[in-house]
């Protein structure tokens, strides 16, 4: 809203209707239909699953997405330069190798556990990227597909007893909502958590590499403003935030009895103490 207000589109001219659906396809579809029913001029979606639901449900309302990891790979857009369809938005993709190398410099990775949701395309893309890095760097992966809340405890039990050196928490609605539980269970077994989930380090993860959420909001606001001023959404290039934070949690490192090398601290942009 701040970005829109700076462009002369404050709350006296723009009505914002916010919905927080349950993390399942039926709830996502019902929410999009509700927006369609009230005559929304633009629909803003958060994450690939909701965005894909919006694409299926509407073809006459512009969609602006945020926090989609790899919009092209996810099947959300045709390209970054010309997304096509009736949408544009903001990508949240960051280099997986930067995160994995930082973790490996703190503690050598022989085995990496992965919590992901096979029903969410962004989570699957991250899984595939880690598989490629594992083949290149020579570590093994233990993959746990967590697609419902009642699967989480079992998955955590498997990972914490499998001898993994780290747990990677892939982006998914379920894992994000349960992140503090994941981190605490892992810590009880001396296992650090790494992730791309925003603010994961503030919740206790050891290392995160994340897009700046404030900048994402600014870029989304610029997309909305351009559409309201008449620009075709499918011709607006997908934006990628320039600010990427490598966050190191020294408090978590101390609790896990790990030393963070100076070369990792030197490349970090934020340190949690």
PLM region descriptions:
Residues 1-273:
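Short hydrophobic alpha-helices and adjacent helix-cap/hinge residues
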């Amino acid at each position: 809203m701040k970005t829109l207000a700076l462009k002369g589109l404050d709350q006296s001219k723009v009505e914002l209707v916010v919905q927080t659906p349950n993390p399942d396809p039926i709830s996502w579809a019902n929410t999009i239909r509700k927006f369609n029913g009230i005559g929304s001029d633009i629909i803003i979606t958060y994450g690939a699953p909701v965005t894909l639901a919006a694409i299926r449900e509407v073809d006459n309302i512009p969609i602006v997405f945020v926090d989609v990891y790899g919009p092209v790979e996810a099947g959300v857009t045709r390209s970054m330069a010309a997304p096509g369809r009736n949408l544009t938005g903001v990508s949240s993709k960051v280099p997986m190798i930067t995160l994995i190398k930082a973790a490996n410099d703190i503690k050598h990775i022989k085995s990496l556990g992965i919590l992901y949701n096979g029903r969410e395309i962004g989570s699957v893309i991250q899984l595939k990227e880690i598989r490629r890095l594992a083949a290149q760097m020579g570590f093994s992966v233990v993959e746990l597909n967590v697609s419902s809340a009642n699967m989480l405890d079992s998955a955590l039990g498997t990972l914490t007893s499998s001898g993994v050196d780290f747990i990677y928490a892939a982006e998914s609605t379920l894992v994000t909502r349960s992140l503090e539980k994941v981190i605490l269970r892992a810590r009880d077994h001396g296992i650090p958590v790494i992730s791309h989930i925003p603010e994961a380090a503030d919740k206790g993860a050891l290392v995160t590499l994340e897009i700046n959420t404030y900048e994402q909001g600014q870029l989304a606001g610029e997309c909305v403003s351009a559409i309201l001023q008449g620009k075709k959404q499918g011709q607006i290039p997908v934006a990628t935030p320039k600010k990427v934070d490598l966050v190191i949690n020294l408090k978590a490192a101390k609790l896990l009895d790990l030393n963070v090398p100076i070369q990792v601290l030197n490349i970090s942009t934020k340190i949690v103490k």
